[in-house]
Amino acid sequence: KKQIITIALCIPMWMQAQNIDHVLQSIEQNNKELQSAMQLTKAQKMENRTANNLSDPTVSYSSFYKNGAGPGHGTEFVASQGFDFPTQYITRNRQADLANEALDKQQQAVRRDILLKAKILCLDLILLNQEKALMNIRKQNADELEALYGKRLEAGDANILEVNKIKMERMNVQTEVAQNHASHRNALQSLLAMNGNLPLEFAETNYPQVKEIMDFNTMRDEVIASDLDLQALSFTTKAAEKQVSVNKQDWLPKLQAGFRRNTDSEMSMNGFVVGGSIPLFSNRKKVQIAKAQALSAQLMQDDARLQVENNLMALFNEMQQLKEAMNAYDMPLLYKSLDLLKQALKEG
């Protein structure tokens, strides 16, 4: 399916596809699912940045008294700020950039899927519009034949079985017309729902012209290079590999610096607070976890690429078979045969 998506959206379209372009532009602006995905991506990207925030500053105040007789009262005020080793912020920032690139590609893939669904509905409507035109011709022929054989029956040139056969054909055509109308209405309603239930019209009867795909290798290279899912997995893999570096640097000490003021009944003193913590326990096995996750991401990327290539081969073969089947149809001959059949029935 994802390969069909890529092919369908990358195929160039000429003037008769302008109506489809207009529909897709409108849906891109008004589709609620797409708007929701954009906001979710925005939130996730900001969340990725929060991992690189400074920790909250700490403030403490102490008051203590001297035991025994005589005055004695002292206070202590400490304000400090903890921070990581400076290189950790640089590494985490690069990891967040890669993770956000993956999110952008995922959001673009959601957009692609939504627009493909809308494009398929447009193509369905084109088919239904073509069927409607053909059924109108069939209905007109059936009406004329029913009137003609009604007169022949009155003149004695036809029997009741022939007239009933014409009437049955006319009823069958009316049933197909009703089914076509229902299918058209359902497809158009689905298109309107994707457009946020805003008004939308689509009366196109011609399919967009497409560039014929002759060489599988060329198609494969183009699709793989532009496949958004593969691009997202590529950035996810790079982000996972960068996370290994982040976790390795988590072994660096956490630093702390601040201001300290002590006072008592006789004097006051100001000074600085400098300290740190060594992550002997909090970072255990995090590097191994990150390496396993990076390997998993790489394997997922390799598997996805293989799936893309296999699906492309199957789709290419199916496309070739459909092309041969379409070439077997002579549409002008079919319409000519319909006219000849109508003329033959009129002449008896």
Question: Predicted regions: what is each one?
Answer:
Residues 1-7:
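Sec-dependent signal peptide recognition
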Residues 15-58, 63, 83, 91, ...:
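Bacterial Sec-pathway N-terminal export signals of envelope proteins
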Residues 29-35, 45-56, 77-95, 105-112, ...:
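A glycine-/polar-enriched beta->alpha junction
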Residues 36-48, 110, 114-137, 144, ...:
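Amphipathic alpha-helical coiled-coil segments
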Residues 40, 64-73, 236, 260-271:
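Solvent-exposed loop/turn segments connecting transmembrane beta-strands
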Residues 57-67, 89-91, 252-263:
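Transmembrane beta-strand segments that form the barrel wall of outer-membrane beta-barrel proteins
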Residues 113-226, 315-322:
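Periplasmic alpha-helical coiled-coil/stalk elements that build and connect Gram-negative outer-membrane
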